[in-house]
Regions:
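Basic nucleic-acid-binding interfaces
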Residues: 1-151
Length: 151
């Protein structure tokens, strides 16, 4: 019997100390680099977007890929890529950790729209509030005092 899976993830992570370093010039190049990592692991990218202080990636995880290793490869690889290509001069690193949330196939289109509209969304709500809302929505237990590294 063949193996078939449908594991739709939204992965979210921020810049170190949530510094607003991901300016618009350079984002498309960064997105293409991350897409290349996903593609090389046979994961299907549905949408990637960011604002100045954090990144959202919506993708289908291939059954042969471990999520933690994939996210580590994305964060380490993209950090080196950003620095080597001087995409964002003020960028120092990604924050430790990430959020990974699963969704049904039926939720995919709404999730893609949500990630596409990050600029408008963050005109009203900061990343901390968005992240806490995601954790609560997904019923993830967390300690709010330990969510983010502070300077």
């Amino acid at each position: 019997m063949s193996t078939y899976t449908q594991i739709l993830y939204q992965v979210v992570f921020s810049t170190k100390y949530r510094r607003k370093t991901l300016s618009k010039p350079g984002r498309e190049q960064l997105f293409r680099y991350i897409w290349g990592i996903l593609d090389s692991r046979r994961c299907k990218l549905f949408r990637i977007n960011c604002v100045e202080d954090h990144m959202h990636i919506v993708f289908a995880l291939h059954q042969s890929v471990a999520l933690a290793q994939l996210v580590q490869d994305i964060k380490v690889g993209s950090s080196l890529y950003i620095k080597r290509n001087k995409l964002f001069p003020e960028f120092t690193a990604w924050q430790t950790g990430y959020g990974a949330f699963t969704y049904s196939a039926e939720a995919r289109n709404n999730l893609i729209r949500y990630v596409m509209n990050q600029e408008a969304h963050h005109a009203r709500k900061n990343f901390k509030k968005e992240y806490v809302r995601l954790l609560r929505e997904q019923q993830v237990e967390f300690d709010e005092a330990r969510l983010f590294e502070e300077e």
